[in-house]
From Swiss-Prot:
One of its GO terms (cellular component) is cytoplasm. This is Transcriptional regulator MraZ. One of its GO terms (molecular function) is DNA-binding transcription factor activity. Its main location: cytoplasm. The gene is mraZ. InterPro entries: MraZ (IPR003444), MraZ_C (IPR035644), MraZ_dom (IPR020603), MraZ_N (IPR035642), MraZ_sf (IPR038619), SpoVT-AbrB_dom (IPR007159), SpoVT-AbrB_sf (IPR037914). Belongs to the MraZ family. Disulfide bonds: none annotated.
Amino acid sequence: MFLGTYTPKLDEKGRLTLPAKFRDALAGGLMVTKGQDHSLAVYPREEFTALARKAAAASRSDPEARAFVRGLAAGTDEQHADAQGRITLSADHRRYAGLSKDCVVIGSVDFLEIWDAQAWQTYVEANEENYSQATGVALGEIV
């Protein structure tokens, strides 16, 4: 499970060091794709494969699903962390997420999100008041 908030730096070559506690879960390969709210999503290869297959199965008859699958496939880069736990983010991914040197990596249970540090702070501040309401939506009657 991916949990927590981390603040790695993006180096001049576009490399980002993944948090050490997640490296074993990502050792089999990982997929970096465009996420929501101009973040990047990082999935373990197996998790991404299941997601992509599910989306592809629905896409044959639904134009919106086909568009999603096309965007997902075109915007995804397969990666393997190097010996120092770094991955290289493509220029397209860095541009999409507006990444500068200061980044934030957050755990989102079954995947990671990579944010520009300022964009993450803005997002947190804008959504702080909605957290209670979102809890009810996400968890329903459990809470």
